[in-house]
Amino acid sequence: MIIKKAELETVCGITSTFPDNTDPEIVFAGKSNVGKSSLMNRKSLARTSSQPGKTQTINYYKVNDDLYFVDLPGYGYANANLATKEKWGKMIEKYLHTSKQIRCIFLLIDIRHEPGKNDKQMYDWIVYNGYQPVIIATKLDKLKRSQVAKCVKIVREGLGLPKNGVLIPFSSQTKQGREEVYEFIENLLAEEESV
């Protein structure tokens, strides 16, 4: 998949009505500062920030005029108050229940650490809502090559990822894993078109 064109089309806050899109939606979820925006920014899709909790809305990016990348607010941001976190949670839940165009949910997890409580809750929540998330294990460049297999195993086991569950190690610095992510999306949409 080659991204030729991408632009921010819709921004939805807590009280917003979600757009009634007809094109497929590819969703990106993850803890604050895990690298969601960095992954999407491979083609200038989203602004990046070193400040966690920056994405506080659901952002729809129109890609190649035929699909959307949907960026969900980062969860687990320590400086957000409880009321704000609850509002974000309700907004995400409303989106998952409302959208009829979700084709895939990518859940980004920091490969350097065992999945935390919020990661596990988000994974279970996505599964409960009828989706099997694809795990993108970010910050790959922070590991030595000899550590990767062990860390991948820890992430898989920490989430309870099934044997056939997809996990893609990714680095925004070296671009490793980027093509696998885009190829996964391309194959998914191609399978859908052939049905």
Feature names for model-found ranges:
Residues K90-G165:
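Conserved C-terminal guanine-recognition region of P-loop GTPase G domains, centered on the G4
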Residues K54, L67, G74-Y77, R112-E114, ...:
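Conserved nucleotide-binding/hydrolysis micro-motifs of P-loop NTPases
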Residues M1-N79, A190-E191, V195:
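Conserved G1/Walker A P-loop phosphate-binding module
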Residues F18-N21, S50-N59, P73-R103, I111-W125:
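Switch II of P-loop NTPase G domains
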Residues V34, A83-K87, K117, K150, ...:
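Charged, alpha-helix-enriched surfaces in structured cytosolic catalytic cores
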Residues S50, L107, P169-S172:
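Hydrophobic/anchoring residues in structured secondary elements
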Residues I3-S16, K142-V195:
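Canonical P-loop GTPase G-domain recognition
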